[in-house]
Amino acid sequence: MKKVVKYLISLILAIIIVLFVQTFVIVGHVIPNNDMSPTLNKGDRVIVNKIKVTFNQLNNGDIITYRRGNEIYTSRIIAKPGQSMAFRQGQLYRDDRPVDASYAKNRKIKDFSLRNFKKLDGDIIPPNNFVVLNDHDNNQHDSRQFGLIDKKDIIGNISLRYYPFSKWTIQFKS
């Protein structure tokens, strides 16, 4: 009888730990489409880290998952609160300086800036808002369609791709 009680206590404790980790630390996610191709492809399995959101540690270039209505999307942060942003002739400019990162150059995006967003006064991203963009230019399930992404809608940043095994990635390069 004591073994059964010990087993049940261990099982309940394990369930509580798993629920805590999935609620506050990390969660698994399957990439549902090719919005972030070639960086992430449909069917890739990733770990989403919730800690960077909780402690305001999101950076430009981070790949995040976020909610929009009942859907979950994956995009890259290209501008954070307090920054300005514009695309001119396929090049990303942040705070009026060209961004030297692979995701920011030679894009098929013509002209796009914060002035395209409705409900935004000025050229500076307000607190707790982000501009996100997909790596795949033709898919506009990002700030071009949704506008600013509120921090409260961000689930976390993708910190690990564990499947397919041949594409194991711990840290995504900008």
Swiss-Prot record:
GO biological process, one term: signal peptide processing
Main location, first listed in the record: membrane
InterPro entries given in the database record: LexA/Signal_pep-like_sf, Pept_S26A_signal_pept_1, Peptidase_S26
GO cellular component terms listed in the entry, alphabetical order: plasma membrane
Presence of keyword Cell membrane: yes
Membrane topology of this protein: Single-pass type II membrane protein
Transmembrane is among the record's keywords: yes
Top-rank taxon: Bacteria
A GO MF label: serine-type endopeptidase activity
Family to which this protein belongs: Belongs to the peptidase S26 family.
Protein name: Inactive signal peptidase IA
UniProt lineage: Bacteria, Bacillati, Bacillota, Bacilli, Bacillales
Gene: spsA
